[in-house]
Design a protein with these regions (language model features):
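Short, well-ordered secondary-structure "scaffold" segments embedded in the functional core
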Residues: 1-163
Length: 163
């Protein structure tokens, strides 16, 4: 569970979608071919749906069996990310509740923590005893976005290919 991209510097109260749109990851997804046509990132419903960023179907009580299965599989895959964050916070307890007041120091602490986490993973450091449990509600955010058609098409293609 290597951390491949970290974008910091925004208050925790800022909506995830706004932070995404300000990140280099958004620019990569929207303006380059680095992610590739047959690859995508996964996210929870706090994020907008794009062809390169796949989110769950909005559960308005009318999801079909394939859509519900897709949401379960996506949630299961996203839990890898949640466990990685739990490992990061477990290894570096300072990141659980940063009390610094200078934003540059907070950013440096988080990025340094991600680097140290990656070094521990690469050296096979066992972190299980330090981990936090992920949130119980995998889709805690209502999907408030009007998804891009290409994102909807990509998501439906994934649903159609699930066993």
């Amino acid at each position: 569970m290597i951390i491949r991209h970290a974008f910091t510097g925004w208050p925790g109260s800022t909506h995830d979608a706004r932070v995404l749109r300000q990140s280099s990851l958004y620019d990569i997804g929207e303006n380059s071919n680095k992610i590739g046509p047959n690859k995508y990132l996964i996210a929870d419903s706090a994020y907008p749906l794009f062809e390169w960023l796949i989110t769950p179907f909005r559960d308005n009580g009318r999801l079909n069996q394939g859509q519900r299965r897709f949401n379960r599989v996506l949630s299961s895959c996203r839990q890898v990310v949640e466990r990685c964050i739990g490992h990061l916070k477990g290894r570096l307890r300072r990141l659980r509740g940063i009390t610094l007041h200078i934003i540059e120091n907070i950013v440096q602490n988080i990025v340094s923590g991600c680097i140290l986490h990656n070094l521990c993973v690469l050296r096979n450091d066992n972190v299980e005893r330090f981990t936090e449990e992920p949130d119980d509600d995998p889709n805690q955010y209502p999907n408030i976005f009007n998804p891009a058609q290409t994102g909807m098409d990509k998501r439906q293609q994934i649903v159609n290919n699930l066993p």
